[in-house]
Amino acid sequence: MIEFRNVSKVYPNGTKGLNNINLKIQKGEFVVMVGLSGAGKSTLLRSVNRLHEITEGEIMIEGESITAAKGKGLRRMRRDIGMIFQSFNLVKRSTVLKNVLAGRVGYHSTLRTTLGLFPKEDLELAFQSLKRVNILEKAYARADELSGGQQQRVSIARALAQEAKIILADEPVASLDPLTTKQVLEDLKKINEDFGITTIVNLHSIDLARQYATRIIGLHAGEIVFDGLVEEATDEKFAEIYGDVVQKSELLEVAVK
């Protein structure tokens, strides 16, 4: 379980990114967070693995505080958290296989991984992960030779090879076309269902949130304004999430982007 206890984040310029967040996400959930740009979605997501440090409060993972973790303890906890970015975050000139093996770095010494000395078991796991997202044939291609959708699937394979217990996906389909968006989200959903990996995804699209989430969390101005099941996420609720200035026609526009 991931638990946020009175979590707040204030940026150096005084902007409040998160305001007293209290939230529990159970193991194996597929949670989609929605809200306007600047609502706090990325800040909340990235605070889980401390890519963003919080100002107040505490974040617990399986009963252990990642907020207080340091050194080896922090590295161990981060090893269980896979991160998927909008920009893919791949080494463009490296092969797909090497990018996936990057998910194993946390399990070995720095010298060993710098020299590319991964055991046979890691290689087998990397190939299995690529096969899982239907991109095994690209194992020896350079990452920059792949389409955006293929690169994002490599990112998912990297998280699988990492044997992550939690996957955080920050706007993973924002730059993808509708067909590729569907493929990437279906990959994430199937992995969630098959392996019980807790998955948190940030999305702008209302339709996609309703289609893939088991639970939707809406943020507005750094606060949770909705937290419920998909069937509870009515148009009226989405209007609250996106603010009074957003009319129904604009909500529909957001949904199809």
Curated annotation (Swiss-Prot):
Membrane topology: Peripheral membrane protein
EC number: 7.3.2.2
Cellular component annotations (GO), alphabetically ordered: plasma membrane
Sequence positions that bind ATP: 35-42
Subcellular location: Cell membrane
SMART domains in UniProt: AAA (SM00382)
Keyword RNA-binding in record: no
Keywords assigned: ATP-binding, Cell membrane, Membrane, Nucleotide-binding, Phosphonate transport, Translocase, Transport
Pfam families: ABC_tran
Molecular function (Gene Ontology), one example: ABC-type phosphonate transporter activity
Domain ABC transporter: 2-246
InterPro entries: AAA+_ATPase, ABC_transporter-like_ATP-bd, ABC_transporter-like_CS, ABC_transpr_PhnC, MetN_ABC_transporter-like, P-loop_NTPase
Catalytic activity line of the entry: phosphonate(out) + ATP + H2O = phosphonate(in) + ADP + phosphate + H(+)
Assembly and oligomerization: The complex is composed of two ATP-binding proteins (PhnC), two transmembrane proteins (PhnE) and a solute-binding protein (PhnD).
Family from the record: Belongs to the ABC transporter superfamily. Phosphonates importer (TC 3.A.1.9.1) family.
Protein's job: Part of the ABC transporter complex PhnCDE involved in phosphonates import. Responsible for energy coupling to the transport system.
Protein name listed in UniProt: Phosphonates import ATP-binding protein PhnC
Annotated source species: Bacillus anthracis
